[in-house]
Each structure stands twice: as C-alpha cells, then as structure tokens.
Regions:
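PAS-family sensory domains and close relatives that share small-molecule sensor folds
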Residues: 100-102, 111-117, 128-131
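Sensory modules in modular signal-transduction proteins
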Residues: 5-34, 40
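A glycine-centered beta-loop-beta connector
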Residues: 32-33, 103, 118-121
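PAS-family sensory domains
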Residues: 2, 120-132
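Generic structural signal for well-ordered beta-strand positions
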Residues: 36, 75, 106, 122-123
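Terminal output helix/cap of sensory domains in signal transduction proteins
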Residues: 53-100
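PAS/PAC sensory module
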Residues: 93-95, 104-110, 126
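Sensory helix hotspots in PAS and closely related PAS-like folds
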Residues: 43-44
C-alpha cells in the first residue's frame, strides 16, 4: 500500500502560507529539489499559474525559464541564487535574465536563501524576485 507523497515540513508549509499572502513574487523549493509553489505575483513574471503544472523538479523549472547572465550568456542553474542557496546552503543575490512560459525575456533580480528549521535541518529554499527592466 502506497503512503502517498511525503508530508511537507512545517517551515515549508509556513513559507508557502507567507508566499500566498504576499504581493512580492516568491517561489519555494523543498529539500528534495522540487519546486513546490510559486505565488500569484510570481505568475505574472513566470507567465503561467502554478496550478497549471503543479510541483516539478527545480531543474526542470529552471530549464523552462532559460536562465541567462545579464549579458545573455548561459547561466548554470547551480550558479543561480536558488542554486547557491540549495547547494551551498547560503543566501545569494543576482541580476539575471529569464524567459517566462509566455516567451517574454525579462531582466530580474533574485534573492534566495535556505530555509532552516530550529534543528538546523534545511527544509528548502525561498526565493523572491522582481523585474528590473532593461
């Protein structure tokens, strides 16, 4: 008998609740590297409601956004703020280019940080971002 998907951690649940109530674009990646949520404000920049695809791997999500350096050169997902927060377990900030599902290339600033619980266990990554024009 299948036990279903693993339960989400309390810090991740609370982060999702925070994101759902903010006008700041935000997305969440769990400790397994799965994109588990992005809020309505993020939908405007990403170009598609979260409910249309649901949870997907962060690698797949990053590939679909075709992330690039400010000058348009390729950007390794590991070097994105979310990648640094996930792999190096530290906050990161960067200006980059992303192409939303709507095909629009945008210059965005992204800040991401690891989400640690009270026991220092990493529960995932929180990223906030905003379009900067240019």
């Amino acid at each position: 008998m299948s036990s279903g998907p693993p339960a989400k951690s309390l810090p991740l649940i609370l982060a999702r609740e925070l994101a759902a109530n903010l006008a700041t674009p935000m997305f969440l990646i769990d400790a397994a590297g799965t994109l588990v949520f992005y809020n309505e404000a993020a939908e405007l920049l990403i170009g598609r409601p979260f409910g249309e695809h649901g949870e997907i791997s962060a690698v797949e999500f990053g590939a679909m956004l075709r992330l690039a350096e400010e000058d348009g050169s390729p950007l390794r997902r590991r070097d994105t703020p979310a990648g640094v927060a996930f792999w190096e377990r530290r906050p990161a900030h960067r200006v980059l280019q992303a192409t939303g599902y709507d095909g629009v290339r945008r210059r965005v600033e992204v800040t991401a940080y690891p989400l640690f619980g009270t026991t220092e266990e990493m529960h995932g990554v929180v990223a906030v971002f905003w379009e900067t024009g240019g």
